Amino acid sequence: INSLENELGVKLLSRNRGGVVLTADGRAVLPKIEKLCAAHHSLMQTVEGLKDMDSGVVKIATFSSVSAQWLPRILKSFGKVYPNIEFEVVTGDFYDQIEGWIVSGTVDCGFLRLPSVKRLQTYALHRDELQVIVPCDHPYADRDPFPVSALAEEPFIQLEEGDDYEIMAAFDEMGIRPNVKYIAREDRTILAMVSEGLGISLLPELMVRHSPTPIKVCHAPLHFYRTIGIGVKDKKALSNSTRLFVDYVRTWVTENGNT
């Protein structure tokens, strides 16, 4: 009480041999103090409820191949275990956009390519091998691995700059440059263009898995990978619902990421 009186600069209690009584100032501020105490109690109850009840809203950032191949199955199976947790899902055009959303707090967690540029706290989930995709009637459709010389000579459909780091690094390691004829943002667009015979491409396996259009998938001349992870801004500051989701994703991908 003495500390509170010093902080407020007013006398709240009158002290005498008979005990203590509220001063006029004390009576004036008492209702406000009671409201503050009630609000604090309500807040603590809510927090404890969130700890005990698996509820809340998790905001997730993702990119197209994870959205298509993993996320629907993850959310479906997670929802059976934690039916009270809700989700908001946003899809980023580029990995750095997703990282920016995590840093700013726009989302609670996000799927991204590792290593993180913005030094987020991350968990590695899956090594995604790059694959050559060609039209089904391509002369080299049955060549596995695909010839290096053909990768340099054939018309190439390139993923838009910003998501193509591993692909360009693979060409650098092979010592060749692709014969780029088209640049596209969406992996599904590239799959359709390859299927129509407009060229070949080099994409991560998760992008070409279960292609909606007919294509032929071949191994690259060498093994190249991108590492997919899930990232958060601060592991220690996660809500209970976000922590449950991140832990669930790590287990799910270990068991199901290749299917």
What are the functions of these language-model segments?
Residues E5-A24:
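A short LG(V/I)-centered, amphipathic sequence patch enriched
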Residues E7-L8, V29-K51:
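Alpha-helical linker/hinge and terminal dimerization helices associated
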Residues D52, R119-L130, V134-F156, N240:
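Flexible hinge/capping segments at coil-to-helix
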Residues S55-V117, A184:
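Central regulatory/effector-binding core of bacterial HTH transcription factors
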Residues W70, K216-T259:
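A late-sequence structural motif
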Residues D93-I98, V103-V107, G162-K216:
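Hydrophobic hinge/microswitch elements
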Residues K118-A124, D128-E129, R188-K235:
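Beta-alpha-beta core module
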Residues Y140, E154-M174, L238-V246, N256-G257:
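Secondary-structure junction motif
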